[in-house]
């Protein structure tokens, strides 16, 4: 009997030794704001992709990243790129391309996106003749977004995302051209991908934008702006003004909290700097240490 009691006591202690750390880890994970690895925008490693696509995919996989937003195919057929992704347990959720392709070659873009396994097609700029985006440009874009977005959704099961680049935040009526675009596109067919640097640089608060339009965002580009860079409405800044998340001007925790509250599912690191290989691991670590 004594032996059984001792044996049971030892067994209980052993089980506690194993289970308590598990409970502790679960409790800790509940306190973390961003415990998972983010996705990445292929533009981050553009020079690497241009030289060696398989090796660059290996770098991404070794960083613990699973989801990639591709902004181009780097000379490959989409089926070949998809095979490389599948072999590494990677996926492409967003396929990005330019205005002319999305608007005038919609079927080709949709076929490529479907082959890659993407859910979304990202469009990153609006053409304009003058130095600045005009209300007429924005109105034309809204009409085209609604038209193409409906086609992509009804014919291919894809969703169109518009990605801001700064000039959309010019004042217009009681808000900005960006407000006009969000408010006049059909949410059934058109959603948005918020690039937080290109919203912050012209004077916007990315977290406030998410809180204002919580149902319209499906993805974020996560990046930070060097501390000594003045904010401006030019829509331009040096690539090396991209710094490690948390080392710059943007309130990253506020952005992530707003995005979590809004239910945004896709987060892509986009580091445009020449130091991306060194900075991306640090940005990932920063995100993993964020507390609620």
Predicted regions and their residues:
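Bacterial N-terminal signal peptides
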Residues: 9-19
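N-terminal pre-domain/capping segments
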Residues: 2, 22-120, 290-292
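Conserved, mostly hydrophobic/aromatic
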Residues: 40, 60, 68, 85, ...
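Acidic/histidine-rich catalytic cores of soluble enzymes
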Residues: 155-246
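Active-site acidic/histidine proton-transfer and metal-coordination neighborhood
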Residues: 66-67, 99-192, 277
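Acidic-and-aromatic substrate-binding clefts and catalytic sites of carbohydrate-active enzymes
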Residues: 45-51, 69-79, 97-105, 129-132, ...
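Hydrophobic faces of well-ordered beta-strands that scaffold small-molecule active sites
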Residues: 36-41, 68-70, 92-97, 121-123, ...
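Bacterial N-terminal signal peptides that target proteins for export
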Residues: 1-11
């Amino acid at each position: 009997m004594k032996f059984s009691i001792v044996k049971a006591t030892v067994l209980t202690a052993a089980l506690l030794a194993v289970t308590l750390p598990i409970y502790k880890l679960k409790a800790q994970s509940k306190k973390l704001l961003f415990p998972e690895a983010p996705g990445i925008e292929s533009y981050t490693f553009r020079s690497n992709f241009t030289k060696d696509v398989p090796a660059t995919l290996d770098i991404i996989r070794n960083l613990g990243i699973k989801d990639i937003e591709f902004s181009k195919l780097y000379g490959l057929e989409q089926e070949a790129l998809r095979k490389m992704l599948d072999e590494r347990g990677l996926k492409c959720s967003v396929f990005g391309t330019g205005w002319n392709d999305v608007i005038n070659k919609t079927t080709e873009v949709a076929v490529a996106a479907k082959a890659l396994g993407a859910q979304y097609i990202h469009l990153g700029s609006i053409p304009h003749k003058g130095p600045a985006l005009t209300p007429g440009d924005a109105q034309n874009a809204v009409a085209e977004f609604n038209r193409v977005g409906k086609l992509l959704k009804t014919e291919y099961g894809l969703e169109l995302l518009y990605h801001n680049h700064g000039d959309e935040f010019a004042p217009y009526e009681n808000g900005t051209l960006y407000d006009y675009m969000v408010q006049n596109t059909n949410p059934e067919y058109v959603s948005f991908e918020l690039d937080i640097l290109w919203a912050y640089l012209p004077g916007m608060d990315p977290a406030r934008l998410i809180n204002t339009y919580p149902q319209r965002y499906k993805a974020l580009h996560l990046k930070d702006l060097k501390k000594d860079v003045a904010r401006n409405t030019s829509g331009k800044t040096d690539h090396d003004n991209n710094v490690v998340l948390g080392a710059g001007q943007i309130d990253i925790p506020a952005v992530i909290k707003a995005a979590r509250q809004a239910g945004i599912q896709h987060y892509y690191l986009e580091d445009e700097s020449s130091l991306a290989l060194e900075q991306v691991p640090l940005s990932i670590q920063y995100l993993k240490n964020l507390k609620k």
